[in-house]
Amino acid sequence: QARTTIHEIEKLWPEVDLLHSNHGSLAYRRAFKAGLPRAYMRGYNEVLEVGPGWKWHNELTIRLPDGNDVHFHHGKSANIMTVGQKQGTCYVQGHYHTKYGISYWGNPSSLLWAMQVGCLIDKDSLAFAYDKVFKDRPIIGCGIIINSQPKLLPMVLNKGGRWNKLCP
């Protein structure tokens, strides 16, 4: 089922820059620890059955229309503003499932920001079962950048924790 959905997404966006994550790389880390040579491992695109237009990065920096750079990483620290300030760029990350927000700071030449985008995980999936022991629940949502400015798009959930089909 996941591949069917991914194929639909690939039709919409045949060229995508994606970030490696601790979830996606788990199989690779376990194989490496067990001593399997890298040559025996299939790449993400082969596993997902997507074309070469999907490119994977550990981290990525792009120039925004306003001239500022924005740095993307799966997750370096729960304090996004500190990471952005140390990078000297705007900054976007995921990883911290219970964090969701935008922080701003200024310097003599510009207004910069950092955005924590939450996650899009199915809280009931086996892959996320480890989270049941934590008191904080995941925040389901994503972020976008329009005209060099960050915007958060939370997934509006009903009382049962399912998407109510509304977009903010």
Regions found by a protein language model. Give the residues of each.
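Conserved beta-strand segments of alpha/beta enzyme cores
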Residues: 15-17, 53-55, 71, 113
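Generic beta-strand structural signal
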Residues: 14-16, 58-60, 68, 141
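Short acidic low-complexity segments
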Residues: 48-65, 76-79
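Conserved beta-sheet core of the metallophosphoesterase superfamily
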Residues: 67-157
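Short, solvent-exposed secondary-structure boundary motifs
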Residues: 44-55, 129-136
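Core catalytic region of metal-dependent phosphoesterases/phosphodiesterases
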Residues: 1-51
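Acidic carboxylate-rich catalytic motifs and surrounding loops in phosphoryl-/glycosyl-chemistry enzymes
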Residues: 17-23, 57-58, 153-157
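C-terminal/domain-terminus segments
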Residues: 156-168
